[in-house]
Amino acid sequence: MYTTTLSVQGMTCTSCVASIQSMLEGVEGIEQFTISLLLERAIAVHDPSIISPDQIAEKIEDCGFDASVISSTEGEHGVMANYLLLSPMQAEQWTKVHNHINELQGVLSVNCSSSPDAAIRVIYDSEITGPRSIMKEILSMGVKCTFQPVDSSTSRILSLQRGSQIRVWKIRFIISISFSLAVMFLPQIFDSCDSMRAAFLVPHYFGICAGHIISLVLSLPVQFGVGRVYYSAAYHALKRGTANMDVLVSLGSTVAFAASIFFMILYSARHADNPAPIFFDTADMLLTFVTLGRYLESKAKGSTSAALSQLLSLAPSSATIIEDNEQIEILADLIERGDLILVKPGEIIPVDGTVVEGSSYVDESSVSGEPVPVHKTIDDELLSGTANGNGRLLVKATKSPRESQLAVIVDLVQRAQISHAPIQQFADRVAGIFVPVIVALSISTFTFWFLFTKYSSKYPSVFDDPMGKFAVCLKLTISVVVVACPCALGLSTPTAVMVGTGVGALNGIIIKGGEILERLNQVDTVVFDKTGTLTVGKLSVTDISIVDNLEELLDIPKNIFWAFVKASESSSEHPIGKAITEKASEFTDVSEIGIESFNAVPGEGVDVVLRWKERTFHALLGNSLLLEHNNVSIPDDFDSKLKLSSSSGLTCVRIAIDGQFVGFLGCMDQVRPDSYQTVSALKQLGKKVCLLTGDQKATARRVAQGLEIDFSDVYAEAVPSQKAEIIQKLKDQKHCVAMVGDGINDSPSLVLADVGIAPINGSGIALESADVILVRKGVLLDTAVSFDLSRVIVKRIKMNLVWACIYNFVMIPIAMGFFLPWGIYLNPMWASAAMMFSSLSVLASSLLLRRWKKPKSLIFSEADDVETESSTNSSVLQKVYTATRSIFGRNKSSNKYQPVANEV
């Protein structure tokens, strides 16, 4: 299967989206198709053997929209596509170039045309080759070649900011407002004095006023210049059997313009003495207000994608590589795996890689949320989009730019913004019947008032118009057509989803789509994996119990004893051994301990013979079995201590030297500093919190006790399949379940849960299975933040929909003349202004989500040994949302995690 991303231009409302969606969903070979009005992007998952990317673009164009393929990649990891522009050549040389490229290692397919200046599209495996290597091969054949990146960061930013679109609509508005104001005010100027009135407002030429001819001429640029956009879109919509906002606008404008010409001809044929009623100003101002609305909408839509633009701007456009001992500056898109990249002080790292030379402090706040610059040296990993400090680094690229963690984050955010929320189905259903209903209501309005004023003598005073009752009925009809606004309904959900998911991404929370947002808001039960999620995922020594007469018993100083412990476990790869080595290093700096023999006993511990000052020592570190097999007895007082520690969830390592028991070390996986606050916050949000782990019950209950999780909600000693069964059991009890985990063994549960949540430092499988990804490393509290954010976004969506419905329910009856008996009616010009306002108000409402701040209860209160963000952090995220700086302060809270007995 291929995943093809397309650019789709010309969509104006949800009716356009619905028509394309319905056209493509039934096409053979297309497995999945989603499209975004705001991003002007479509993503198709399809079988290329049945339908090609270009054929998908053609089908979209058949609907009346401009479409082009941005990228098309196979489902396999590392498979990429790019375009290369070649110089003109003969057909024979084209064949040679095609065949040569096709034979290159890593190239999967080549599509090219024999026409001059055509582009070849190369699909390749980025783990084997890249665009720069392919270009070198083409250049070696004497053919000039230019790289044309597919969907580069720069082009995507420009597209999202809608700069060209905003300029076009601005020009259209200036043209329309200039001519419309002239058409509106010239008749008033002509009527200002008798001589001008006689010259311009009295029929002279074939019964037509000169002023009317001038108004007609001035209206032409508006109707057939600016208005052509609406008429063309309306034509294509009707051609494909649908009706959208363009149809309503075109209908209202056409009726007013055509009626004006009709009356001019009619009065001319009758040689009438009075000037004909004309509505050129109505037609022109209608288009002017709509054009102003489109201009302001374009600017507002550009703001809705500000978060995605900021993420894209993190990656640099160029990079310096070292090739043949020379520094060469290239486009960042041309970087390939294995390239050596020179990163100078202050530069942005262009691609994920590892340090091969140099050291420096790197600011990772923009990508990982780590606020304090991290020291990087040889073999350390670097992330694209992070900022180098004062050092000079030589970096080996481990991924291509489009596979970097930053690119993955951007792709996830964009896919989330393209996806449709289930609540959007309501707007889609309404949009499907909206225009036909409005047209029917407008015809009914005209018919009713025309007949009413004709056969009744008691009609509202508004019909006593110099232009006649027919003209007033026509204006009411136009008002009904124009005031109705399906756009407000259509924009309610996608704008809120786009802004909301963008805000989430900037705060380190990636929500994979509108459907996930809704489910996240419905969750009532949150299940946590223990190891690596609620806990750090790294064992540490928390309990030390050593005999009082250690030095007399062994005839060695205490620091030498710790040196023995350190040396005994230094060769161990077991997590417990590493934890003991780290703890022992705190008590000794002695290193001249010799190891004569080392034996790791599976399931028991280590058996080591040590040498110090020409003396040998036999050391045993392990569980009770190791000591039993070596005939070492444990004193009764220590035996009771061991039982107490073991029952509280500690892993106890017994220590014996030369056959004598000297004590034990208790190890455990430390609870994360913000776990208590996370659990507490979730409970405040009304969520039930459960603990699910494969560890023993004592360990699980010990963690649950410290976090105040009910023992009845603790599920211990569960293998991956049992974890999934527990999730299903909770769902069967009518709970909406969220699973939070980071390991491979959590993947089945993450998939089965209604919402899967995983930290970005989790396993690759867990990240693929998760619906929500927490980008900020080590900040579990973002789990609770994601629930609060989803609640706010869904609430905003509902507010938008309610407002859009209220607007139409109120304004349409007013336009139809329901309140004419009380002198309340709606002029077509003001109807178009109201329609514009309704769409803009929904956009403004969604943009208010950018002001969202974390509740104070969800701001992490840190211990002194935990590094987090400070108020002076200068990341891009904070530059975008300066209002959220306060959330990163070091606020103290009484809800800090309190260790239970034996933890320290």
From Swiss-Prot:
Domain of life of the native organism: Eukaryota
Keyword Membrane: yes
Magnesium keyword on record: yes
Active-site residues annotated for this sequence: 529
Molecular-function GO terms, alphabetical: ATP binding; ATP hydrolysis activity; copper ion binding; P-type divalent copper transporter activity; P-type monovalent copper transporter activity
This protein's UniProt keywords: ATP-binding, Copper, Copper transport, Golgi apparatus, Ion transport, Magnesium, Membrane, Metal-binding, Nucleotide-binding, Translocase, Transmembrane, Transmembrane helix, Transport
One cellular-component annotation, GO: Golgi membrane
EC id: 7.2.2.8
Record: residues binding Mg(2+): 742, 746
GO BP annotations listed: copper ion export; copper ion homeostasis; intracellular copper ion homeostasis
Residue ranges, Cytoplasmic side: 1-172, 219-246, 297-431, 491-805, 850-904
Subcellular localization, as worded in the UniProt entry: Golgi apparatus, trans-Golgi network membrane
Lumenal, vesicle membrane side: 194-197, 268-278, 453-469, 827-828
Membrane-crossing residue ranges in chain numbering: 173-193, 198-218, 247-267, 279-296, 432-452, 470-490, 806-826, 829-849
Positions contributing to Cu(+) binding: 13, 16
Record field: catalytic activity: Cu(+)(in) + ATP + H2O = Cu(+)(out) + ADP + phosphate + H(+)
Membrane topology recorded in Swiss-Prot or TrEMBL: Multi-pass membrane protein
Class in the EC hierarchy, top level: translocase
Entries under InterPro entries matching the protein: ATPase_P-typ_cyto_dom_N, ATPase_P-typ_P_site, ATPase_P-typ_TM_dom_sf, ATPase_P-typ_transduc_dom_A_sf, HAD-like_sf, HAD_sf, Heavy-metal-associated_CS, HMA_dom
Domain HMA per the UniProt entry, residue ranges: 2-68
Assigned protein family: Belongs to the cation transport ATPase (P-type) (TC 3.A.3) family. Type IB subfamily.
Function field: Probably involved in copper transport and in the regulation of cellular copper level. Retrieves copper from the metallochaperone atx1 and incorporates it into trans-Golgi vesicles.
NCBIfam families from the UniProt entry: ATPase-IB_hvy, ATPase_P-type
The name this protein goes by in its record: Copper-transporting ATPase ccc2
Native source organism of the sequence: Schizosaccharomyces pombe (strain 972 / ATCC 24843) (Fission yeast)
